[in-house]
Structures are given as C-alpha cells and as structure tokens.
C-alpha cells in the first residue's frame, strides 16, 4: 500500500489518469454515479442485517463487502439519496455521514452489503481517464438501501477462508464423493484473514472480529482500498498512453516441438528444457496431443494441478482414454 499511495496514484495523476473519491467528483460525474447506482447497481444489491431474529450473514471467500452501522431514525427528514434529482445548475446534494457520540446500543444495528462481482470494480466516469471504485458508489447511496435508518459508519472488508481439502484416501471407499463433499464444506472454512481499511470504525471492527471469529493476528488494516487486484484491469480501461505500456511478450516455441515435427523423434536426439512463461506452453500441449494419437504410446502418466474448464490437456487425455491408453 505504500507503493500504491506514494508511487502508483501520483504517477497515474501525472499522466492525467485518476481514480477519484466521491468528494472529488464534479456535478456531471456525481449525477453519472447516481444514475449508475439507480439503473445498474440497486436492483442487484441485497442488504443483510444481523439482529436477534437471524444469524450473522455468511460472508463467502474472497468476496468484497461493505459493513454498515445503522440506527433507526425517529423522525426521518430526508428522502433516500438515490431519489435526489439534479436539475439545471442546482447544487448536487451530497449527504454526509455524521458522527454521533450519544449512540444508544439498543438502537444500533449491523448490516452488510456484498459488492456484486458481475460488474467491474472500476467504473469509468465522464472525462478522459477518470475512474471510481464501485464500492465507493454503493457506499455513497447506502441510505437508499436502508430507508428509515441513519448511516453511522461504513467500511469495505474482505475475508479469506481456509480452502484446503482434507481427504484421507485410506479412510473412504468413495474418493470422488468424499472430494465433492469437501469441496462443498470448504466454502464454509474458517476465516484465515480479514482485511479492513485502517480508518474503520472501532464498533464495526469489533462486530466483524466477533462474528467472523477472527483473531487479532488475522486482522489486516490496510491504508487504502481493500483488495488492489482491480489495478490489473486498469491498463485495459485506459484510453491512449501507449507509451506507458509494456510491449506484448511472445513466448518462444522451439520449432522441433511444434505439430509439424515428430516430438518423439526430436527428444530422442536431445533433451529440451522449457521454462514458463519464457517458453511457450504449447510445446507441452503438442507433446500430449501427439502421445494421444500415436499408436506406439501405451499410456500417459502425468500430474495435473488446477486445470481450466476448457483445458486442451484434458481434451487430449480424454482422446487418449478413448483409445484405451
């Protein structure tokens, strides 16, 4: 986060690329996010409360969420934020979350809102290369999700759960069924890491620690947005600035290992050492492909780890299995 705050953000700004906070938006940009919330986000958001009538909401692994501290309004005096309308040059209404020192514990509630993964984390704003985080948009208009309540504090957070599989092959007669059961159960594994912003309200932090059963050493307070993986997508969203981009890297494929050559003949003559990503993995795919269709190959034995759903390796292994290998 030191690199993010002291290098990445300033360097982006020098090149007129901005990740803006709500407080820095002009009227046109603010009206844009208001409409974006109403039209795109609000229909898919599901606020979940924690009270005596229901258990603490389940927080799935690696999901981004917004924790909310609420208090019921006795005399609501304003409409939900999302109903505000910008007309002409009228000043944009920007509701502020007011701190309260006289909080009554009986009236204070905890709620959480999951940030939908179907939308990009970065939202493009009007203006050249201006962006805002989707969780900032949701936070700005939370009052529309909780009518009749006052928002006292908010904070984005993310949990990482123990996703290890623990299957003892010698103790089960049906390994496939045991693995399937473990895959379902690991989604509810214990929380190994809780990430929150360093500015989080103490009450919210205590609620998360207590209800997620997290130890203090598993709590990570970060100086910036929770989950910086959105930066991976930024380069593809920025217009222009080709001078700032790395040239595309093309891995090397040895001609002796392509499909136009018999790879078995090539490796009889010499050994080939490949290092990914510098060497093209297609050489391995070609090798398995040729082994699958070569009638002199009796069996293929290999170790696979986390293959994709459309893996060509799986395709050719299936082809080999159909031929009795």
Indicate residue ranges for each PLM-predicted region.
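N-terminal localization/anchoring segments of enzymes in phospholipid and broader phosphate metabolism
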Residues: 1-325
């Amino acid at each position: 986060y030191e690199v993010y705050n002291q290098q990445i953000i300033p360097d982006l700004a020098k090149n007129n690329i901005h990740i803006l906070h709500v407080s820095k938006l002009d009227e046109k940009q603010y009206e844009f996010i208001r409409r974006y919330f109403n039209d795109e986000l609000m229909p898919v958001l599901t606020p979940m409360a924690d009270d005596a009538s229901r258990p603490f909401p389940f927080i799935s692994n690696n999901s981004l969420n917004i924790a909310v501290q609420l208090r019921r309004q006795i005399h609501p005096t304003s409409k939900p934020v999302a109903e505000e309308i910008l007309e002409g040059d009228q000043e944009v209404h920007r509701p502020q979350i007011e701190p309260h020192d006289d909080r009554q514990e009986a009236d204070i509630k905890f709620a959480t809102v999951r940030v939908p993964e179907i939308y990009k984390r970065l939202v493009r704003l009007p203006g050249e290369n201006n962006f805002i985080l989707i969780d900032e948009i949701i936070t700005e208009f939370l009052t529309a999700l909780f009518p009749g309540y006052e928002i006292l504090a908010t904070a984005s957070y993310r949990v990482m759960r123990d996703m290890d599989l623990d299957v003892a092959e010698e103790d089960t007669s049906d390994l496939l069924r045991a693995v399937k059961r473990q895959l379902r159960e690991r989604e509810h594994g214990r929380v190994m890491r809780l990430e929150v912003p360093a500015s989080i309200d103490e009450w919210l932090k205590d609620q998360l620690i207590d209800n997620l059963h997290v130890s203090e050493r598993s709590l990570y307070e970060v100086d910036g947005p929770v989950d910086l993986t959105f930066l991976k997508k930024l380069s593809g969203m920025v217009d222009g600035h080709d001078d700032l981009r790395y040239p595309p890297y093309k891995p090397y494929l040895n001609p002796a290992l392509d499909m136009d050559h018999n790879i078995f003949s090539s490796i009889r003559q010499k050994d080939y050492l490949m290092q990914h990503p510098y060497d093209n993995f297609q050489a391995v795919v070609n090798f398995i492909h040729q082994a699958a269709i070569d009638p002199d190959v009796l069996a293929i034995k290999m170790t696979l780890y986390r293959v994709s759903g459309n893996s060509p390796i799986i395709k050719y292994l299936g082809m080999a299995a159909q031929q009795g290998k």
